[in-house]
């Protein structure tokens, strides 16, 4: 228990004065940081740092300018250009007319600095949440509605697909490798343009329905919990689950091991006679071929079960 003299000494402390001094120190520090960032050529310095850090990897992104905005604090980047080598691919660079990085309150699960990145590509608005931790990053898309046709350049020349899909993604990355993943994607108007299969050109596939659930708890394996393609009127209907061992830097070469079933409409089989030849050795159940998908993500191979 405190003595009378100790209580008296506590009462003598001028707490209001100490609070005022602390607030004054914080205010002076804030004004110093504000003045420094307002007049310091942060854009040129940041561009130099980025180029130096990434040039050894064959990646040289560029932008016109970067500046700070203090109303709802954020960094604004204009005319961002990301060359294809930065994404470990070939082809033209990706251009973003603007990109804003908005700072949020410190995140504790996982611990790190959280940001919201707002931009657009091909007329498609994009909103990505990013947490930068000590040893990795966490990327989050919250029920993002995406127009696949507008994002075609992001997929590369070998992926042709259109329609609108809603994506909910939570992905952790450590040392440029996916450490954990939770993904849900859904579409009601998915269309695959004409494709060439062994010399035969397929008609446009109006699949309409797409539903995907995938998780990953240990790299590089991604577990496909559910993959449903095509509604009752679609020329192709399929239902699969299984696993993909994702190859870092070359996703197309990722080995597949999916099991499920697939069915084709009569009109589609007549338009593409090779279908009957390809699946003549497969068992059928209720009009669906029982299939195991092997091969790779870029070149899947149907195998009879």
Language-model-detected regions and their locations in the chain:
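Flexible, solvent-exposed coil segments and beta strand-coil junctions
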Residues: 144-152, 217-223
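Beta-propeller and related beta-repeat scaffolds in trafficking/envelope systems
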Residues: 85, 89-106, 182-221, 265-301
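N-terminal type II signal-anchor transmembrane helix
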Residues: 2-55
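Amphipathic hydrophobic-ligand
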Residues: 59-60, 87-101, 118-127, 151-171, ...
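Intrinsically disordered, low-complexity segments enriched in Gly and acidic/Ser/Thr residues
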Residues: 204-274
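Terminal hydrophobic membrane-targeting helix
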Residues: 35-116, 120-126
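Short, hydrophobic/aromatic-rich segments at coil-to-beta transitions
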Residues: 110-117, 137-138, 219-226
